[in-house]
UniProtKB/Swiss-Prot annotation:
Pathway assigned in UniProt: Carbohydrate metabolism; galactose metabolism
One cellular component term from this protein's GO annotations in UniProt: cytosol
Gene Ontology biological-process annotations: galactose metabolic process
Protein name: Galactokinase
Primary role: Catalyzes the transfer of the gamma-phosphate of ATP to D-galactose to form alpha-D-galactose-1-phosphate (Gal-1-P).
Localisation: Cytoplasm
Length: 382
């Protein structure tokens, strides 16, 4: 049974009438451009065919009822007439409440709604299950009440909800790609202007995501430290963000910087350049150049930004040994565990899967999870 069928059936059973709309919003993977988003830089993600699906209908009052199919059909109810506050027990409900509250704060006028939510974006894998939920809820209200919002505004609203209501600091990339993703394309995003450019993906190439299943422990504290180091670097150059510093300017005075800060700055500057070049390489179907850029990105994250762990490096090495220069592979996400992403010719996917199955657990004691994805369409009706 598809997520659409599942949520429609649950909706009818729970609420006693049929849903009028079904909306989906996808998760994402970032192909290249790591930790560049909060430095006003470039990222190159694609939406994936794992998504959050919501069957819904408008109500003729001011009540919101939300059922979470993946959390034992837990039900949350709240009124649009009262101040929206955090739910004491259901963390999932706060993503919904946050999006609704921030849409209200943006002076959008809408009535009540019934929703049933289900999703298959793996949680805790760095594939943006939370952003996909936020964008799905925003799209539900936009579609049901014809709100004058475009995808970028729905994305910004979701980011605001996560930062201010849920209390998790995140950049804009995750929500933006979920809202604006394009089938068979990646999206080059300028995180300063929020401008986007669709980049066609080469035919016959699979997007493979492998979760190391190494439990991330340092990610919060180390993430904040990296941010501070980048801000220190930008201040040294008297610029608003590292986006505004050239590699030539950096090389001329690198020796004057604190050695750790210098390494962090070098990663951001070179990663930004790699990301813009990767968009061109991908569009031209130049997998050999993509391989080089992804390898350089991984080495930079390992040696300059210092956010990889041995388990991730092992996974990258296993995949690289199989694909050679026919595709690219690197760590993706915040670091200290999580996933790797690989662009692999479809005919090599079984060999990669076999090599990883045979070697990764033997070397690390951890079993990986393997996902083969297609670049998918952003949020909308399904």
């Amino acid at each position: 049974m598809s997520l659409k069928e599942k949520t429609q059936s649950l909706f009818a059973n729970a609420f006693g009438y049929p849903a009028t709309h079904t909306i989906q919003a996808p998760g994402r993977v970032n192909l290249i451009g790591e930790h560049t988003d909060y430095n006003d830089g470039f990222v190159l993600p694609c939406a994936i065919d794992y998504q959050t699906v919501i069957s819904c209908a408008p109500r003729d009052d001011r009540k919101v009822r939300v059922m979470a199919a993946d959390y034992e059909n837990q039900l949350d109810e709240f009124s649009l007439n009262a101040p929206i506050v955090a739910h004491e027990n259901y963390q999932w409900a706060n993503y919904v409440r946050g999006v609704v509250k921030h849409l209200q704060l943006r002076n959008n006028s809408f009535g009540g709604v019934d929703m049933v939510i289900s999703g298959n974006v793996p949680q805790g894998a760095g594939l943006s299950s939370s952003a996909s939920l936020e964008v799905a809820v925003g799209t539900v209200l936009q579609q049901l009440y014809h709100l004058p919002l475009d995808g970028a505004q729905i994305a910004l609203n979701g980011q605001e909800a996560e930062n201010q209501f849920v209390g998790c600091n995140c950049g804009i990339m995750d929500q933006l790609i979920s809202a604006l993703g394009k089938k068979d394309h990646a999206l080059l995003i300028d995180c300063r202007s929020l401008g986007t450019k669709a980049v066609s993906m080469p035919k016959g190439v699979a997007v493979v995501i492998i979760n190391s299943n190494f439990k991330r422990t340092l990610v919060g504290s180390e993430y904040n430290t990296r941010r501070e180091q980048c801000e220190t670097g930008a201040r040294f150059f008297q610029q608003p963000a590292l986006r505004d510093v050239t590699i030539e300017e950096f090389n001329a005075v690198a020796h004057e910087l604190d050695p750790i800060v210098a390494k962090r700055v070098r990663h951001i500057l070179t990663e930004n350049a790699r990301t813009v070049e990767a968009a061109s390489a991908l569009e031209q179907g130049d997998l050999k150049r993509m391989d080089e850029l992804m390898a350089e990105s991984h080495a930079s994250m390992r040696d300059d930004f210092e956010i990889t762990v041995p388990q991730i490096d092992t996974l990258v090495e296993i995949v690289k040994a199989v694909i050679g220069d026919k595709g690219g592979v690197r760590m993706t996400g915040g670091g200290f565990g999580g996933c790797i992403v690989a662009l692999i010719p479809e005919e090599l996917v079984p060999a990669v899967q076999q090599a990883v199955a045979e070697q990764y657990e033997a070397k690390t004691g951890i079993k990986e999870t393997f996902y083969v994805c297609k670049p998918s369409q952003g949020a909308g009706q399904c």
